[in-house]
Amino acid sequence: MRDFKNIKIAVAGTGYVGLSIATLLSQHHHVTAVDVIPEKVEKLNNKVSPIQDDYIEKYLAEKPLDLVATLDGRSAYADADFVVIAAPTNYDPVKNYFDTSLVEEVIDLVLEVNPDAVMVIKSTIPVGYTRSLYVKYAQKGVRKFNLLFSPEFLRESKALYDNLYPSRIIVGYPKILDRLEFAEENEAIRSVTDVNMLQEAAKTFAVLLQEGLLKKILTHSSWV
């Protein structure tokens, strides 16, 4: 069983989802926020929010956050226990399609530099997407693939507030489902990860989210 101590976290994306999570988690843990826009990285390293959010602005200015920002995803992910993926997934209503290409770019880089890391998708994704990734990457011959999903329930400009006072916390992990139609997914999951370890990782991540809350709530770890 993997031991999660002295946890280091990387967050891919500094939009309202990624930056609010990075701010929340950096109250108690070292967090590296990764973005591709130099101006956003520079602002964050100067304790200035690149997005409009009163609570993020206040926390960056007044709280002793253990938060740094970088353009170098490779280095950030190589040193992380958890990689939170908050890359944009733009939705096309005409095609009824989420563009998940940026999510998979992050996954590919994490697998290249740190396959032991536990990845947590916070981006908005289609139903069944997480399990489909287990099949996709198992077919690619990947030997380790540790992926969780934790949906966000945030409002723009109120993202950190909603993380500090959440209505619920959900962290999903893959489960072996005893039905014939899930046989391919089950085989893929077994081939690339330790489900028991991921269940513990899901519980650990839920605890990390709870540590910085201003409102204590019950959490829910479930399968995806």
What is the meaning of each model-derived region?
Residues 1-224:
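Structural/interface elements that position substrates and couple domains in central-metabolism enzymes
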